[in-house]
A protein has these predicted regions:
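Short N-terminal helix/helix-N-cap motif within the alpha/beta-hydrolase-1
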Residues: 16-17, 119
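Histidine-anchored nucleotide/phosphate-binding helix
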Residues: 18-41
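Short, conserved clusters of charged catalytic residues that mark active-site
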Residues: 17-18, 58, 92
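Short glycine-rich catalytic loops that host catalytic nucleophiles or stabilize transition states
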Residues: 38, 77-81
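Cofactor-binding loop segments of dinucleotide-utilizing enzymes, especially the Rossmann-like FAD-
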Residues: 10, 38-40, 148
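Short, glycine-rich nucleotide/cofactor-binding loops
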Residues: 7-16
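Metal-dependent de-N-acetylase/amidase catalytic core
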Residues: 1-8, 25, 29, 50-54, ...
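Short, surface-exposed acidic-centric catalytic microdomains
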Residues: 33, 39-73
Length: 227
């Protein structure tokens, strides 16, 4: 990879769960990695405005800490409603994504898989697909989709496209940083056995590595590559 990398995620912690080791690896290689969270990640949890604001501040602080651990160059926080992005017109989601792509002149974009259970994930995938159309002069040359434990694999069989990875990144040297970033989101972790537990995240990295001959890996689906 070369140039600028942009991760377009729904919620803080999606970036770590889906590709934290890859972020750390690319940052270590000297690439500018930018992370954008489009939804607030908390507003669906409580009807109390004060509690919502406190949760929002805590979640964003955790996100900044995690991104600092991974070596992210910049972090953007959007304010689309959590778990309600299906109530937003698609064009209104596309526009800020296009602005971010143009701002960072992103050569590579990572985003959610089309078949995730979470509605915000699916909506962002749809918007990114439109925003990154391969028009003449468009900066994005590679579009990859990541998995998110407790969303991607929980979709019902046959209900949506299946995540079938065809692009793997060796994160054997950066798994420790991924797990440290996961710990920054302590409030979002679940006890084992749960795919979004620390142990679950580590197990997934081991499994994704084992199926391609690495100690640890992250798996992606290549949506498009222009060479």
């Amino acid at each position: 990879m070369k140039g600028s990398v942009l991760i377009l995620a729904a919620h803080p912690d999606d970036e770590v769960l889906g590709r934290g080791g890859t972020i750390a690896k690319l940052a270590h290689q000297g690439l500018a990695v930018h992370v954008a969270f489009l939804a607030d990640g908390v507003s669906s949890r409580s009807g109390d405005p004060t509690a919502q604001q406190d949760d929002l501040i805590s979640r964003r602080m955790a996100a900044q800490k995690a991104c600092d651990i991974l070596g992210v160059k910049s972090v953007y926080f959007g304010d689309f409603p959590d778990n309600r992005m299906d109530t937003i017109a698609l064009l209104d989601i596309i526009k800020p994504i296009e602005t971010l792509v143009t701002k960072f002149q992103a050569d590579t974009v990572f985003t959610h898989h089309a078949g995730d259970m979470n509605i915000d994930h699916r909506r962002i995938h749809e918007a990114v697909s439109v925003a990154c159309r391969p028009q003449r002069g468009h900066p994005v040359k590679k579009l990859l989709c990541f998995e998110v434990p407790s969303s991607t694999e929980w979709q019902l069989s046959g209900a949506a496209p299946t995540f079938a990875p065809n692009w793997f990144v060796d994160i054997s040297d950066t798994l420790d940083r991924k797990l440290a970033a996961v710990e920054a989101y302590a409030a979002e972790l679940r006890p084992w056995p749960h795919p979004r537990s620390r142990r679950g995240v580590e197990h997934l990295a081991r499994w994704r590595g084992a199926i391609v001959g690495f100690d640890d890996a992250e798996a992606f689906m290549l949506g498009r590559q222009l060479a």
